Amino acid sequence: MSQIWTKEKFISQVQGGVIVSCQALPGEALYNEEFSLMPFMAKAALEAGAVGIRANSVRDIKAIQKVVDLPIIGIIKRDYPPQEPYITATMKEVDELVECGTTVIAFDATLRPRYDGLVVSEFIKKIKEKYPNQLLMADVSNLDEGLYAFKSGVDFVGTTLSGYTSTSVQSDEPDFELMKKLADFNIPVIAEGKIHYPEQLKKAYSLGVTSVVIGGAITRPKEIAQRFINVIK
């Protein structure tokens, strides 16, 4: 299952809907060393009306592509210590994601030191030179990073990393302020991070974002169970 996704076509597909993040990392209950369980999550998301999928690793992306014909925001989480960025942190991960036909490649666009020694604008330029038609999403943690990444040529800006860097707001809530400020610059914003309740989804859309990614609240059973159990402890 594959089709050509332009920026306009992708926006038309995901605008106003829910993109479901289907991820499981080693050590988590839904991670299986022998085969990916994420296609089951993706199929359930499709049946519920999801407009797209966010997935991690070539293995999961390929498996998901076999069962749903939705656009996929793809990432590869790979540590490069001592540097902090680990979401599609080098061209190696970009090459792997392009090879498996990922619709949109998301990457860490924070201004933290990178393993490859490049600044974000240089990384974006290298990707665009090598893959001029590849759609890109910058995962950022604050306004300056979002504006910088968009000016450097990304197609979408995600609020994914707000709360996960020392230069961003530390909160258990979604960063609604960042969503609004980015959207006010007419940037196609994909809201992501700590969106746990339907009311938060509605609020994100009221701020002018293009689309919304929801992950743990839908596809991480341990997190979902803990949210209930913690209120009765």
Curated annotation (Swiss-Prot):
Gene3D superfamilies attached to this UniProt entry: Aldolase class I
Task: Note whether Ribosomal protein occurs among the keywords.
Answer: no
Could you tell me what this protein does? Converts N-acetylmannosamine-6-phosphate (ManNAc-6-P) to N-acetylglucosamine-6-phosphate (GlcNAc-6-P).
Q: What gene name does this entry carry?
A: nanE1
Pfam families recorded: NanE
EC number(s) for this protein? 5.1.3.9
What CDD domains does the record tag this protein with?
NanE
Q: Which PANTHER family match?
A: N-ACETYLMANNOSAMINE-6-PHOSPHATE 2-EPIMERASE-RELATED
Coiled-coil ranges (or none): none
Which pathway does it operate in?
Answer: Amino-sugar metabolism; N-acetylneuraminate degradation; D-fructose 6-phosphate from N-acetylneuraminate: step 3/5
User: Can you say what this protein is called?
Assistant: Putative N-acetylmannosamine-6-phosphate 2-epimerase 1
Q: Which domain of life is it from?
A: Bacteria
The UniProt entry's sequence similarity note says: Belongs to the NanE family.
| Keyword field | Carbohydrate metabolism, Isomerase
Q: Please tell me which top-level EC class this enzyme sits in.
A: isomerase
- For this protein, the parts annotated as crossing the membrane are none
Q: Which organism is it from?
A: Streptococcus pneumoniae serotype 4 (strain ATCC BAA-334 / TIGR4)
Q: Which GO terms describe its molecular function?
A: N-acylglucosamine-6-phosphate 2-epimerase activity
Q: Which biological process annotations from GO are given for this protein?
A: carbohydrate metabolic process; N-acetylmannosamine catabolic process; N-acetylneuraminate catabolic process
